[in-house]
Amino acid sequence: MSISKIAKLAGVSTATVSKILNGKDQAISEKTRQKVLKIVESEGYIPNAIAKSLKIKNTKTIGLIVPDVMNLFFSELARGVEDSADRLGYSVILCNTDNNSDKEKKYLQVLQSKRVDGIIISAVESNKNICFSNCITPIVLMDRDIETDKPVGRIKVDNIGCTYDATTHLLSKGCTNIGFISSDTTNVLSRDRLKGYIKALEDNNMPYIEAAVYLKDYSIETGYLGAKKLLDNNKIDGICCGNDLIAIGAIKALKEKGIHVPKHVKVIGLDDIFISSYFDPPLTTIKQPIYGMGHEAVNLLIDMIEKKETNLLRVLNHRLVERMST
């Protein structure tokens, strides 16, 4: 069903139909307006959003690219983006890269071809060569310190501060041999989390022992394997984990060895994904405002789309959430 067909059925011009559909019908009689709207409803007319966007130069659509939508961190982040975008009248196209830099590049191209107004991206950790030079669409980077060849918005937390505070908390609980399990240091985020752990040890006159560190990725399996390895070689009484999934895996390994958490080994995570409070034991963690990060990313992106004067870097606060694992 086209506008011309509606106009023919209503016995009016296409210009009249267009004005009614776009709310610019002040000079049109109520009788004519109701007649056109009745035909529109009965015929199931759906406006061509892409064609309309070519005239008004926007699609009211934003793209969201995440590395792993199955990771509860990114699920909550995506919800924050979607809810905030919806309140502002925007739709969201979600793209999952599976931590694949080639898919990431493809999705950047696809989203631009769909004429999205802006893109929010949590880039693949290992993708050091991500290039935005050919991307005219406004971009906001989520929690990633990546050098870019064009100005982009950035939403961050203080990753050094997160693990510094986590390690300091374990020390305050009497831990003297603290292990660290996290992702490998191929990106700034992971390097900063390791730095925070080391700095906390140094500031408290505790030795940094390389054998007490296990680095792989941000998965439950990493926590499980890492805890088993640390226990084989060290008298660990505390474990600082790079995220909550790692902490959950570590606690599973400890339980299998008959080690009580927190009596014998205390464990702290990072993120505060929703399952952390329901785990056994409920997980002490450093809370990142995950949902709020999504909300703030949308606000920043809209400011960029509307070409408002704005600070392109926004650093959000973290805080300790103490539960039963420490």
Predicted regions mapped to residue ranges:
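N-terminal helix-turn-helix DNA-binding module of bacterial transcription factors
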Residues: 1-59
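Short beta-strand segments enriched in small/hydrophobic residues
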Residues: 16-19, 54-68, 169, 177-184
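Amphipathic helical "hinge" segments at domain boundaries
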Residues: 30, 43-110, 114-117, 195-198, ...
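Hinge/beta->alpha junction and helix N-cap segments in small-molecule ligand-binding domains
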Residues: 67-75, 94-103, 144, 155-165, ...
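Periplasmic-binding protein-like
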Residues: 108, 116-123, 179-181, 213, ...
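Flexible loop/hinge segments that line or gate small-molecule binding clefts
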Residues: 121-165, 186, 245, 271-283
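Short acidic capping loops at alpha-helix termini that bridge into adjacent secondary structure
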Residues: 176-177, 208-212, 260-266
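Flexible loop/turn connectors
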Residues: 228, 233-326
